[in-house]
């Protein structure tokens, strides 16, 4: 059996510092990290399940790991991940994903946050961890992630994560939490373009854009018209219509110079009909993109929504992230990174037509397929 792919993982984790004192190092750190990644790919969600996977696959694991004292106990896995420096693991993770990500003009990088709901520790006053991720739509890869104590700290985490990534010629999309002048400026200074949803509590900006589109979606204003596109999706007893209007008419906004490179305003309307009821929602965006038609802009907006469907949903449903109880030290944050790495590898494999759950089962049952999944990281 080809073991080059598993051995490559040893090199991936080479830069991670071991937090243990020498006398407690019965097991190699790289062994612990690689076993955990393989186990998570194969369906393990808890430290007990990681240990069970290790003993079930111990002969195969010995073909590329040292395992001087066999498989570590579930307590050992938990202790090591609780003490492991999250920044070290993130640095290795980011170097790997950025090497794989397509560096092409127009690629979309979506920033969004997700709370690991059961990572809180009420007894010790520890809030649930909120992970901010950067998602590349073209590769369906998580490019990087940072942890914050709560959702409100996304405003601080986004610039920090952005500074670590290459967004040259990329379109960076962020929801309303990230609609900040400093963030827009940083994206442009790093060579990217921005498409930011406007917050409702940004009264002057939000209300002025709303007033403009309330009229512009009905009739031209002084000869100015908006580019328009409409998509209709029907199925499962519902009909969803998405309409988008874009305009590069920005002269009316007196503070436009405060937003670096501002060139266009966007209005997206979602109309949903289900069970005899209709709901309509409008969202507004600002962007430094120009010369694009409404259809292209809607593609970018919908591309941002994909982070919810293709990343957050998979972590909740396939990896049960919101039900898991890793609370001690850095264990929740570090294991979250392992789950995202596993998801990246599983998504990159195109040889199996099953969904993520099916691929995890296939990897557990067939070592050849597990090696194939691991090879997607080489």
Where are the language model's segments positioned?
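Dynamic "connector" segments at or just before major functional cores
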Residues: 1-111, 116-121, 133-145, 159, ...
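Short acidic (Asp/Glu) and glycine-rich catalytic loops that position anionic groups and cofactors
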Residues: 14, 189, 277-281, 292-294, ...
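A general alpha-helix detector
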Residues: 31-37, 76, 296, 300, ...
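A residue-level signal for conserved active-site and pocket-lining positions in enzyme catalytic cores
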Residues: 35, 112, 140, 194, ...
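Generic secondary-structure signature for well-ordered alpha-helical cores
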Residues: 86, 98, 163, 214, ...
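Polybasic low-complexity intrinsically disordered regions
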Residues: 99-193, 199
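An anionic, glycine-rich sequence signature occurring as long contiguous blocks
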Residues: 193-303
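Basic, amphipathic alpha-helical segments enriched in Lys/Arg and hydrophobic/aromatic residues
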Residues: 299-378
């Amino acid at each position: 059996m080809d073991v080059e792919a598993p051995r490559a993982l040893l090199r991936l984790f080479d830069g991670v510092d071991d937090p243990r004192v020498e006398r407690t190092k019965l097991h190699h750190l790289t062994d612990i990290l690689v076993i955990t990644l393989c186990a998570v790919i194969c369906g393990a969600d808890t430290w007990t399940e990681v240990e069970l996977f290790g003993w079930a696959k111990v002969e195969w694991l010995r073909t590329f790991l040292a395992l001087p004292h066999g498989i570590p106990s579930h307590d050992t896995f938990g202790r090591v991940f609780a003490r492991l420096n999250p920044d070290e693991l993130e640095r290795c993770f980011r170097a790997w994903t950025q090497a794989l990500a397509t560096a092409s003009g127009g690629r979309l990088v979506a920033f969004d946050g997700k709370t690991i709901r059961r990572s809180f520790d009420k007894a010790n006053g520890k809030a649930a961890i909120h992970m901010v991720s950067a998602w590349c739509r073209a590769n369906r890869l998580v490019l990087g992630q940072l942890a914050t104590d709560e959702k409100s700290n996304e405003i601080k985490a986004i610039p920090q994560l952005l500074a670590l990534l290459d967004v040259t010629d990329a379109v960076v999309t962020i929801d309303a939490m990230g609609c900040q002048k400093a963030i827009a400026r940083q994206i442009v200074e790093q060579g990217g373009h921005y498409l930011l949803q406007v917050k409702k509590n940004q009264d002057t900006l939000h209300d002025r854009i709303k007033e403009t589109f309330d009229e512009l979606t009905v009739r031209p204003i002084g000869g100015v018209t908006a580019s328009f596109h409409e998509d209709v999706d029907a199925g499962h007893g519902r009909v969803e219509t998405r309409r988008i209007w874009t305009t590069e008419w920005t002269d009316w906004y007196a503070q436009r110079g405060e937003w670096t490179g501002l060139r266009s305003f966007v209005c997206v309307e979602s109309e949903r009909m289900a069970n005899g009821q209709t709901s309509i929602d409008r969202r507004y965006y600002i962007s430094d993109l120009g010369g694009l038609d409404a259809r292209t802009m809607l593609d970018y907006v919908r591309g941002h929504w994909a982070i919810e469907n293709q990343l957050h949903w998979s972590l909740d449903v396939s990896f049960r992230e919101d039900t898991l109880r890793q609370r001690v030290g850095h264990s929740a944050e570090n294991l979250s990174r392992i789950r995202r790495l596993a998801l990246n590898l599983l998504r990159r494999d195109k040889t199996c037509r099953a969904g993520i759950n099916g691929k995890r089962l296939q990897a557990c049952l067939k070592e050849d397929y597990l090696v194939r999944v691991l090879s997607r990281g080489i």
